[in-house]
Amino acid sequence: MILCISQDNSPTEVVMSIVTISHAPYSGGSEIAEKIASVLNYRCVDREVLIEASRRYGIPEAKYAEILEAEGHWWERWMESLRLYRITLQAAMCEVAQEGPLIYYGRAGQELFPGISHVLKVLIVAPMEYRMQEVKSQKGLDGENAKHFLRELDRVRSRRMRALFNTEWQDPVGYDLVINSSRIATDSAAHLISQTVQREEFRPTAESEKTFQDLRTTARVQAALITSPKTRNIILNVRSDGGQVHISGILADPDLEKEIVRIAKDVVGVTDVMTDIEPPPIEYMHP
């Protein structure tokens, strides 16, 4: 996002288009992302989002990397242990995106901007044989060793994305554009993506800008609540509409509602807070 000066000399925020590049390991996705950034003069970011999340919320960058890339524990699928990382990662992504147009080729980009029409979501794929050649070139592995290495990377990433977002990251339905890098060269892929993101369908509109602002405020409030010692274990629904924040959920301790409102009101971009908090069912409190 950038600041422009309107005719009445007041600053106005202008949202620019965003491209997310999800890619199979060793499919050339990083090179394509960097080429697009060069063509469009966009920022190209990856771990910068993890650094921003770590700086804002005091969570080590290495922990985010572990959550996104390493083999998960069996209990994470049923417990809410990943909620902290999912929420703070999205909040950090929104903060990075507000600084201007960007290409994001890190993990989970396709899931971090739900409902934003000026985000072009791209998936880069390639056949196993092509990726095996890349592994041989970069790591010296070949044959079954290369294939096992890639299958393990794919398995771990798929498991992590299911645990974090309950989604299959390789499902093409979740993307606007799918490119086979074994058939389309880096320069051609970058040209195709660059042309697509400049089309009418992906240009920011007043509606998409508002949707982004609402997402950013929602993410900020969610992150503030989940990083506060008093409210971190409470699951709440948060929604922002033009700065008016609506918070709903079930709360066993009614005194915490004031704390929830206080935390939300302290968030930048929040103009008002409305709550719809209910007590737990009687059978829950007295089994």
Feature map (PLM): residue ranges:
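Short, Lys/Arg-enriched N-terminal segments with co-localized hydrophobic residues
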Residues: 1-15
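Glycine-rich phosphate-binding P-loop
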Residues: 21-34
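Post-Walker A helix-loop "phosphate-sensing" segment adjacent to the P-loop in P-loop NTPases
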Residues: 39-45
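Long, charge-dense
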Residues: 50-66, 127-128, 132-156
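ATP-dependent small-molecule kinase phosphotransfer cores
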Residues: 50-104, 141
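ATP-dependent NMP and nucleoside kinases share a basic, alpha-helical "lid"
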Residues: 102-138
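N-terminal targeting leaders
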Residues: 115, 126, 133-137, 153-154, ...
